[in-house]
Design a protein with these regions (language model features):
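Electropositive, gly/pro-rich neighborhoods at or near active sites that engage anionic ligands
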Residues: 2-179
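C-terminal functional extensions of proteins
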Residues: 3, 211, 217, 223-327
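Short, basic, glycine/proline-bearing loop/turn elements
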Residues: 156-158, 182-185, 235-244
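Short amphipathic alpha-helical segments and helix-helix/interface helices
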Residues: 173, 196-200, 255-256
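Structural motif
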Residues: 181-183, 263-264
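Hydrophobic anchor at the start of a short beta-strand
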Residues: 182, 206-207, 284-285
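Histidine-anchored nucleotide/phosphate-binding helix
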Residues: 185, 189-209
Length: 327
């Protein structure tokens, strides 16, 4: 069945609807993002349009509708919801045209070729857990569309022993050691291969891997999960959000149940951070390359830096560095 991005999400399960309402009420003004997010979403939409047939009038109409959406209320929307709506506009103007899989398959193929060489690249001083974690983290910053296999491996090698701007890896390892159920939120195609590499290093835990809608651009979907054999190491769950990231208030019943059961939540990428940041959930760890200063200013680091961050722990760290005005 065609999965229309622009249809409004409707959840029939009363328990999920109630939980979503509670989450919405819990979001009280500390969302990540500002006016700069508009230009970021526009760039993402322009990138999506490159995969579609070269229809100049349709592309102009898409960008006009995105600008109108922002002017008519998008400025007050959460960043993830605005991006979801913008992707929906693309789907509306190009109904039933699904151009992404060939591009994503090529991204996965490059990652898989690099994956076959990863074990021989692991430094002797780096544990299997740390190397798996750093490989997954490197995946968040690699351009799998354009990078060669050599460049991909160089990205992993460079990060294997590098100092991170924020490094809560030890806390993550401790929490994983205590956990029975882990929820892992996917980001993009290609990157999913390195997620699998990290998940394989985890033992004694049940892992749920949450994927995105197959029509949401280059986001990792169930199709990608099947292609890279993710189901052999994790239980794959569709998030139901019709977006390039997971959004708490739009999770499917199954994804919501997985969210509630998880002892630890590992999220990839800035969009998942933005979506879950307002929940103040101590279970959440985010692996990403900081994409912009709007994100960096919240975490207290610069754009372009890599982080393994527990947002709640980071809040506490930053609060301790603030000097009272009257001190």
């Amino acid at each position: 069945m065609y999965c229309s991005l622009y249809e409004m999400y409707e959840e029939q399960e009363s328990g999920v609807a109630q939980g979503a309402a509670e989450i919405g009420a819990a979001q009280h003004g500390d969302e990540i993002g500002d006016f700069r997010c508009f230009s970021c979403v526009c760039r993402n939409v322009e990138h999506l349009l490159e995969a579609y047939p070269p229809d100049k009038s349709a592309r102009k109409a898409v960008m006009a509708d995105v600008a109108r959406l922002y002017a008519e209320g998008g400025v007050d929307m959460a960043h993830a919801d605005f991006q979801r709506s913008a992707y929906g506009i693309v789907a509306k103007h190009f109904p039933r045209i699904l151009p992404f899989w060939e591009h994503k398959r090529a991204m996965n193929d490059r990652a898989l070729e690099a994956y076959s060489l990863l074990k021989s690249h692991r430094p002797p001083s780096v544990s299997a857990f740390k190397y798996g974690l750093r490989t997954a983290l490197a995946g968040a910053g690699i351009d799998f569309e354009r990078s060669s296999v050599a460049e991909i491996l160089h990205g992993v090698d460079s990060l294997a022993t590098a100092k991170l701007a924020i490094d809560h890896s030890e806390l993550l390892q401790k929490k994983l050691g205590e956990a029975k159920v882990v929820l892992y939120l996917a980001n993009r195609a290609g990157e999913i291969v390195f997620d699998r590499f990290f998940i394989k290093s985890l033992s004694g835990v049940e892992v749920g891997y949450v994927v995105n809608c197959p029509y949401a651009g280059y986001a990792a979907s169930g199709q990608d999960a099947d292609y890279v054999d993710m189901r052999s190491v994790a239980k794959v769950v569709a998030n139901g959000c019709e977006a390039p990231s997971s959004i708490p208030v739009r999770l499917s019943a199954r994804a919501w149940e997985s969210f509630l059961k998880a002892d630890v939540i590992v999220a990839k990428g800035a969009m998942n951070l933005a979506s879950f940041y307002t929940l103040h959930d101590p279970r959440l760890f985010v692996l990403m390359r900081v994409p912009c200063q709007a994100i960096g200013s919240v975490l207290g680091c610069a754009a372009g830096e890599y982080v393994v961050v527990n947002p709640e722990a980071r809040r506490q760290e930053l609060s301790r560095t603030v000097t009272p005005r009257n001190a």
